[in-house]
């Protein structure tokens, strides 16, 4: 059993509540499930994440992959969770070291090529990450907005490979 935990942020008005992304890679028939997103968002995120991992020269794990986004009662919309889902899968499948993730938060929509796309709420997410003592890894296209937060700790990236 392999489990990894990655942190991200939702968006609720001007607030950006913490979202814990748990990724589990286990044996069994190949299956990729995401729990905690509306059905349409789940299908779209699954397709984007799988394609981005493959085109970025990572291996999508064989077997059963389950991702849980919590808290379950927090509305989760848009592709902002693509990057943390991908990072969680990579850590749970031992393609990247999980120990380095504890002080980081991730947000970004993935294109099928692995490029990161802009998301809304970068400033609010940066404030939340800073308040919790973490560095925010975010798409380069919104890094200027995120850097407006005093004491902001951000790492801009253009693609999954940059991360």
List PLM regions with ranges.
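Peripheral, non-AAA+ core regions of ATP-driven protein-machinery
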Residues: 1-163
């Amino acid at each position: 059993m392999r489990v990894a935990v990655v942190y991200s942020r939702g968006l609720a008005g001007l607030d950006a509540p913490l979202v814990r992304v748990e990724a589990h890679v286990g044996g069994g028939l190949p299956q990729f499930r995401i729990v905690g997103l509306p059905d349409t968002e789940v299908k779209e995120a699954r397709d984007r994440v799988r394609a981005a991992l493959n085109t970025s020269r990572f291996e999508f794990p064989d077997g059963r992959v389950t991702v849980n986004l919590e808290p379950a009662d927090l509305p989760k919309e848009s592709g902002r969770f693509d990057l943390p889902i991908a990072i969680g899968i990579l850590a749970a499948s031992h393609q990247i070291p999980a120990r380095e993730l504890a002080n980081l938060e991730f947000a970004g929509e993935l294109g099928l090529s692995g490029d990161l796309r802009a998301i809304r709420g970068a400033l609010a997410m940066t404030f939340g990450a800073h308040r919790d003592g973490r560095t925010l890894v975010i798409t380069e296209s919104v890094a200027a907005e995120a850097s407006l937060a005093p004491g902001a700790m951000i790492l801009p990236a253009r693609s999954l490979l940059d991360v």
